[in-house]
Amino acid sequence: MLAILAIVAPVFALIGSGYLARRIGVIGPHAVSELNRVVVYLALPALLFDVMAHASWSVLYQPDFIAAFGLACGAVFYVTLAISLIAGRRLATASLDGLLGAYANTAYIGFPMLLMIYGKESLVPVTIASILTVCVLFASAMVLIELASHAERHPLRLAGKVLGSLGRNPILVAPILGVAWGATGLGLPASAETFLTLLGGAASPLALVVIGLFLAEPRPIAASETRTAVGLAAVKLVIHPAVTALLTIAFAVPPKLAAMAVLLAALPTGTGPFMLAEFYRLPAVVTSGAILLSTLAALMTLPLLMYFTGISLAP
């Protein structure tokens, strides 16, 4: 319990620092939008390019793990999306709901937690999960939000507009360029490596600070929004790992890899959905609430999962 608390404490500290800075007036009301643009246009693209440029595809080729974790993410995303649409939410916000239910905080919590449990052998599966989450799942939600944002109904013209918007989106372009660079077999200069490491490393911490800034703004919160945030946090912490566990059995994933997949799926929601909400100017009350609630609740759900599955943190 204390070991998990030590891992997630910096998450709350970053959110709290943003909240406090806004409440005492050190940072102004426009900071949420402007700082989020720093994340979306600079830090996150650098991180995604770096991850994809250094991906060793021969090492990352773990078909059973990829199938189980990837299909679980997709199933939770699209089923949650469908339920939200049936409940009357629009496609853009329903896409965020789907992302909230399936977007695990693999980078900020997953890497250190699994490193404590499994050591360096956890790096490959966590990297795979991060690529599936940050690139594939994130891009899927982005495409749907782009589709929802265009009024054009002619299929070809709509496709052209959506592709044009996606082609100008650094969050999607950066990993594609990273894959292209990695395929050349050329290494990056040391100065470029340092640049990407420094800039990419700011993505998650800065996004957490921005969430704190957002939460500090006084705004009315409807009871329905609170219920939705609680429900989405439950989907992330209970349904997502349960579906992943079933699929690891279906695909006969080796026990240790299966345990890693379930633990990664059981992580709280990462900051990606909030970045998208701010980037597309979508309502972010439910999004920020679900991220905060899932992170708080994970302090109880992760130890319970480890207890019932016999997993223990290394001292």
Placement of each model-derived feature along the sequence:
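Alpha-helical transmembrane segments of multi-pass small-molecule/ion transporters
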Residues: 1-315
